[in-house]
Design a protein with these regions (language model features):
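Glycine-rich phosphate-binding loops of nucleotide-dependent enzymes
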Residues: 2-7, 35-283
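Cationic, low-complexity basic patches in intrinsically disordered or flexible, solvent-exposed regions
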Residues: 23
Length: 283
């Protein structure tokens, strides 16, 4: 669980007021959430907006993720899912709004590297692994250790690191294939390996973009099991279009539309929402 700073409430209030002044707003917009939500959440977005060349990609987005929570994010193309993740990871800075991590850290003030070091990891839809290295070496390269490839590969692996690698390979079900080249893996297995590489960075929050895309039915089912196992010790945001996969996850769903939250709740509830049916499910 994430340890929260006892002084986070006052610090977070100062961050919000500073953002208001910085963007020239005469009055503080009404917050969607309570102060308790700000300081108790692992991730807190409130009133976040960003525009690109006059197009408002995110408009007044408010969202909280609790420590140890897995959340599914759905929405049609252009709903703002990718931009939301870009904001969380520091790739895109919002025009206005509050983005806090761990109750006290203002993510809008940090660059991508600092946010990654803080404990936010992102997995893109297309897996990126070192094809000509073994599965085990891919995990070793991702561990928090000396950063150059040569130093990492030839570094004396301590017992604790060896155990960590074994644990990760067990979680992603690739322990028996540890000596295989990553390039020989199936698409689904490469997805699992990249998730394992993300785990090697000890993230508090994982952002996972369409993990089931291009997978067989069997791989999709295994991926749901994998993410549920990971969510026992981490917070996870899953962006996905496969409703069957989301049903397997069995988690709260947030529906985005035109850059803001349209609906939230269990999948059956949001699927029955008339507005969701109209703008997302297409019937």
């Amino acid at each position: 669980m994430t340890a929260f700073n006892p002084g986070a409430k006052d610090h977070a209030k100062g961050v919000i007021d500073s953002n208001i002044r910085e963007h020239g707003l005469g009055e503080k917009p009404a917050s969607t959430f309570s102060r308790h939500a700000l300081t108790s959440s692992l991730l807190y977005l409130d009133g976040v907006s960003v525009s690109f060349d006059g197009f408002k990609a995110i408009r007044g987005l408010s969202l909280t993720i609790e420590p140890g929570e897995m959340r599914a994010i759905i929405g049609p193309n252009g709903a703002g899912k990718t931009t939301m993740m870009d904001i969380i990871t520091g790739k895109t800075k919002p025009d206005v709004g509050t983005v806090m991590f761990g109750g006290s850290v203002d993510l809008t003030k940090l660059d991508e590297a600092a946010i990654a070091n803080l404990g936010i990891g992102r997995k893109f839809q297309k897996p990126t692994v070192f094809d000509f290295h073994t599965i085990e070496d891919n995990i070793l390269l991702a561990l928090k250790a000396p950063r150059s490839v040569a130093r990492t590969l030839f570094w004396q692996t301590a017992a604790a690191q060896a155990k960590r690698i074994d644990d990760i390979l067990g979680i992603i079900k690739l322990g028996d294939a540890r000596d295989r080249l990553a390039g020989s893996l199936s698409h689904g297995q490469k997805q699992w390996l990249e998730i394992g590489m993300l785990l090697a960075q000890d993230p508090k929050l994982l952002l996972v973009d369409e993990p089931a895309a291009g997978m067989t039915d069997g791989e999709t089912a295994e991926t749901a099991v994998l993410l549920k196992a990971i969510a026992k010790d981490h917070s996870v945001i899953v962006v996905e279009h496969d409703m069957g996969f989301i049903r397997e996850l069995g988690v709260k769903v947030t529906v985005l539309h035109e850059g803001s939250v349209l609906a939230e709740g269990p999948l059956d509830v949001v699927s029955a929402n008339e507005r969701v049916v109209e703008v997302y499910l297409g019937r």
